[in-house]
Amino acid sequence: MEMFTAIFLGDTFVVKDSFNFLPQSLEKLVSTLVRKKNANHRVLFKNLYKFFKTQNPPDEKAFDILLCKQYYPYEYMDSWEKFQSGLPPREKFFNKLKDIHLTEEEYSHVENVFKTFNMKTMRDLHNFYVQCDVALLADTFENFREMSMRIYGLDPW
């Protein structure tokens, strides 16, 4: 029997552990959707597109950037003052959990994000990172739910 982690908040709101349904990283789930043949990415990723078009309508290049893995300097962001600073150097993106640094190519992607979306501060990058992550997660769940209902006639949520 499979076990699912769920938190019940009253009678109408339930938070379920999505990893039980989709046991892959968000990066892998998104790349699977991106590779769908004949797929319109603005339809597959409608939450992502809807959110970012209200701020600054993304052209194709900018929208492709949204579909890539994003990077965040978790350990570096240890004070409110750092939200007011500009983009930190590459070594500040060190990941203690995985014991790895960003590659030059990965940092170049961060610089490209900063430039493409007219960011000035780490607050801008932080908000972009969180909003992009949540929108991609929502789109991934919605695609999984639609597929489950279409193929199996079951709503996983």
Predicted features by range, described:
Residues 1-157:
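Metal-dependent nucleotidyl/phosphoryl-transfer cores and adjacent nucleic-acid-binding surfaces
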